[in-house]
Amino acid sequence: MMLKTVIYTGVLFLICNKVLVRADPLYSPYSSKDLANLKTLLERFEDTLGQDEGNDNQQDYDIANPEAEGPQAGSPWDRERERQWPASDYKKPQEGYQSQSSRLRDLLMAPRNNRGSSGCFGSRIDRIGSMSSMGCGGSRKG
């Protein structure tokens, strides 16, 4: 019974000691004045950021929609390019993607060699056998 009382008292003492240590402002890494200054600085920064964000959104909209201001005269370079290559000659991005994917598909489906597999083993074994003349399709040298 005495042992339980000592253990409970010791645990209670450690808990109270930890709570009191945390409550003491001396153990805080920052003073309340520093925290107040930091808070006001953060509020000012958020206000400035909010004002700048409104201006940036308008600029982004203006850049994204140049047609809203009206048709602009193109540079001589652009006009020369349009005269040489009309817009109908340009391929759409999807057409380029489809041609690339069909080329890749053809490459994957193409046989590795025109001779083909002998059917005895897999193509890898046939290649090893043809190099060592010990496979199904290899000729024996005697």
UniProtKB/Swiss-Prot annotation:
Protein role: Hormone playing a key role in cardiovascular homeostasis through regulation of natriuresis, diuresis, and vasodilation. Has a cGMP-stimulating activity.
Start-end of Basic and acidic residues biased regions: 77-94
Region of interest: Disordered: 47-123
Pfam families, per database record: ANP
Signal peptide boundaries: 1-23
Record-given protein name: Natriuretic peptides A
Species classification: Eukaryota, Metazoa, Chordata, Craniata, Vertebrata
PANTHER family, A to Z: ATRIAL NATRIURETIC FACTOR PRECURSOR, NATRIURETIC PEPTIDES B
Protein modification: Cleaved upon secretion to produce the functional hormone.
Tissue: Expressed in heart atrium and to a lower extent in heart ventricle, but not in brain.
